Amino acid sequence: MIYLYLLCAIFAEVVATSLLKSTEGFTRLWPTVGCLVGYGIAFALLALSISHGMQTDVAYALWSAIGTAAIVLVAVLFLGSPISVMKVVGVGLIVVGVVTLNLAGAH
């Protein structure tokens, strides 16, 4: 269940981050409301996953890595962001770092 909380937290964070540009500096009401609600839900669900037993370092590392990869994917597919070798390498390094952190915590 803690991983479900975390995955939902990541989803909410990705949605909120994807709305940031459309808020136009938090001057547009509904995108701003959606963005802030999304971040609120994301942090509440992250807190639930941690309070139900997930280690904070693991939760935050997974949140960061999966969230970053998902935001890059959303930005490239839906927001017109160009893809580059450096973006792919950067996301790959983040994923390798998270795997390493999780393996270190498993022993």
Curated annotation (Swiss-Prot):
InterPro entries to which the protein is assigned, alphabetical: Small_drug/metabolite_transptr, Small_multidrug_res
Domain of life: Bacteria
Keywords: Antibiotic resistance, Cell membrane, Membrane, Transmembrane, Transmembrane helix, Transport
Gene Ontology BP terms: response to antibiotic; transmembrane transport
Localization per record: Cell membrane
Protein topology in the membrane: Multi-pass membrane protein
GO molecular function annotation: efflux transmembrane transporter activity; transmembrane transporter activity
UniProt entry tagged with the keyword Ribosomal protein: no
Chain segments annotated as transmembrane: 2-19, 29-51, 58-80, 84-106
Keyword Nucleotidyltransferase tagged: no
Entry GO CC: plasma membrane
Misc note: Extrusion of TPP is inhibited by CCCP.
Role description: Multidrug efflux pump. Confers resistance to tetraphenylphosphonium (TPP), erythromycin, ethidium bromide, acriflavine, safranin O, pyronin Y and methyl viologen.
Similarity annotation: Belongs to the drug/metabolite transporter (DMT) superfamily. Small multidrug resistance (SMR) (TC 2.A.7.1) family. Mmr subfamily.
Name recorded for this polypeptide: Multidrug resistance protein Mmr
Species whose genome carries this gene: Mycobacterium tuberculosis (strain ATCC 25618 / H37Rv)
